[in-house]
Amino acid sequence: MKLLAIKVECSYELEDGLSFFMQDELDAQGIESRKRSDFVLEGQKHDSSLVELDDIENLPEDLELTAYFEYKNADKKKIIQKITDKIAEMKGYGLDAGNVSISTKEVADEDWNTAWQKYYHVIDFSRHLAIVPEWEDYQPAFSDQQLIRLDPGLAFGTGGHTTTQLVLLAMERALVKPMSVLDVGTGSGILAIAASKLGASHVLGTDISDEAVTAAKENIALNNIDNIDVRKANLLKDIDEKYDLIVANILADILLELIPDLDNHLNENGKIIFSGIDYLQLPKIEKALEENNFVIKMKMQEGRWIGLLIARKPN
């Protein structure tokens, strides 16, 4: 099967929003995100044989985002126009699009299935967690370091993005055994797996995408974990249970939809972790939390991305 690859070179500020749009709205079969800084820094830190420096030199200074579509069903001109319109919309929110360039090419499906693996390598996140591709042999750097093994497949998170790492950082601080955890928008399942590894008694991961549910289940199986359930759900709809910790690494506009339903799904003294928030969108998140009787206990920032640890206001 042939695939149509549409490559967008732009500012990293568009990464989350544009990735979500191409996957969710345009039904991309896969998303590949590459930044020169990611590979150079990780290559220097881990000396990974998966990092090919010759290829790095060909990367743009900012972001290269490639979406893959089934060739026979793809309307190339229509897709490019929709991407162009979305970029214009995001610029209207105040995001810097950088120097935008869009190009296309045909690729063989079998080439994609293995070629992307060379860009995915160990992320030695902390003394407690390391994210490891399932084909790599990696020994923990610390005796108590937990390994999260992932096969990211065609799409979904690999743990390398700042927004994911902000959640992991907050989870290391906030998750206490034996908390129950709800991961809204689980994607690859990385946060659900991390919660289990950090001592959660039970974890539920939800996603609106059938493909994400399948990917998460496969990654959970790779880690031999039996206390995580995954189901298809739209945010908190059809979720009846309450949890000690709710995590959501999704776009700010979707977090705004989530906030009014949080109280009904949070146990007494429960906590919430948000990420995926561009700093320009933080004021409206803060306003919605205030209006729904929540208070921010900890704020984390890396670049323009914000992570929040949230609790109910004290009585």
Curated annotation (Swiss-Prot):
Source organism of this protein record: Lactobacillus johnsonii (strain CNCM I-12250 / La1 / NCC 533)
Catalytic activity: L-lysyl-[protein] + 3 S-adenosyl-L-methionine = N(6),N(6),N(6)-trimethyl-L-lysyl-[protein] + 3 S-adenosyl-L-homocysteine + 3 H(+)
Keyword Transcription attached: no
GO BP term (any one): methylation
Cell compartment(s), UniProt: Cytoplasm
Protein's UniProt keywords contain Membrane: no
Protein name, per record: Ribosomal protein L11 methyltransferase
Keyword line: Cytoplasm, Methyltransferase, S-adenosyl-L-methionine, Transferase
Top class in the EC scheme: transferase
Record HAMAP family: Methyltr_PrmA (MF_00735)
Family annotation (CDD domains): AdoMet_MTases (cd02440)
Family in the record: Belongs to the methyltransferase superfamily. PrmA family.
Pfam assignment, any one: PrmA
Source domain of life: Bacteria
Molecular-function GO term, any one: protein-lysine N-methyltransferase activity
